[in-house]
Amino acid sequence: MVKCSSIIHENKKPAQLLPESKFAAITKLSLAILSLFLGIAACILIALSGLLPNTLLIIALSLISIIVLSTGISLLIGTQCSKSVQKDEQKPKSIFPKETPSLDPWLLNPLKNKIQSSETLLLDPTSINLKNELFFPSFEEWKKIFLKDPDFLIKSALANWKILEQDEQYILSHIHMDPRIFVTSEPLQKTYQKLQEKHVNNLGIASQVSLTDLQNKTQYENNLIETTTNEITYYFPVVHNPDILRSEWDPISNQLYLIFKKFFIHYHNLFSTALERNQILLIDSLNTGSSNPIARQMELLAFLCVFEQLDYNEDEYTIEPRDYFNRFVYKNSQTAPQIQSFGLLHGYEEMSYASNNIRNVLTHSIVLCSPILYQLITEFDTTKIHADDFDCLI
């Protein structure tokens, strides 16, 4: 049973009053002093109007007028400055850093060498554009499902998986998916060294690379770079935070939508290619470097959701946002008529009514380096099986 824990969303927070600026405080104080000064001056002039010559009265009135005019101009300037400060304070601040996390040097340097020697492959941009149109085309429909309570949605999604706990990792298996997912909190390089000690064969390694690391070359933007070294296939989804921060005035919810959609497509591109080529996939989870909890939840949801879509040929059936909710929460995986889901099972060609022949899955293990998902599973309120006799990959 999934336990729904309430979290405070940014779109649910009541509007907070802005703290009074220094200019506003000075303005109020100046108005009080000016009123007091004018009151005293008026009383004095009335009392002395019959005693002072007209010349002195005119001079006194002129001085008072100059003081009033100067004070008024100062107050006007102060008020405008105060409005400017308040406007800056009200301006929405992005929850994503402008700098995209860079690829570790142990992978970046060989990648640059491969690029220089033209030993890399790029995904067809037409395919990327097509997926961008197919997957989550409506921001409003996505927002209704994914921003209502992302914490509950993640836990509901995890409840669809059988979770095995062993040593310092969690093993996730799904009834509709042959590959198992090994979740670890250890960094990619350390996990890779452990796999090397086990002498695994047909390994694929995936880690995001920043477009900045590639000198912002437009041909790599939002693409998937593939290269091979020493019988290991490397996959590099190209992530670019400024692509998300198109405008500083974009609503936060729109930025969350963009990061979810882009990461979903990155994962879909990666798995659509690698599941047919590598027996073991070692993946460093995609991330923007944001410390915002909701942003990190969107990064996780993109990963968890992509396996639902990978079960189908996107040309035949594209899952809608409300379908993810039905699958995760109500455990209702009914599909469109005459569409069967065998996209993530081995030996699909042997199934009698498998009309969804989209990939020949070769992968049996996906090793995901994700401290965030590891911690979330650790705190997940469900029964986890201790797999003492379960074969551990790493």
From Swiss-Prot:
It is found in: Cell membrane. This is Uncharacterized protein CPn_0129/CPn_0130/CP_0642/CPj0130/CpB0131. The keyword Cell membrane applies. GO terms for cellular component: plasma membrane. The chain crosses the membrane at residues 31-51, 57-77. Belongs to the chlamydial CPn_0129/CT_036/TC_0306 family. Keywords: Cell membrane, Membrane, Transmembrane, Transmembrane helix. Its main location: membrane. It is a multi-pass membrane protein.
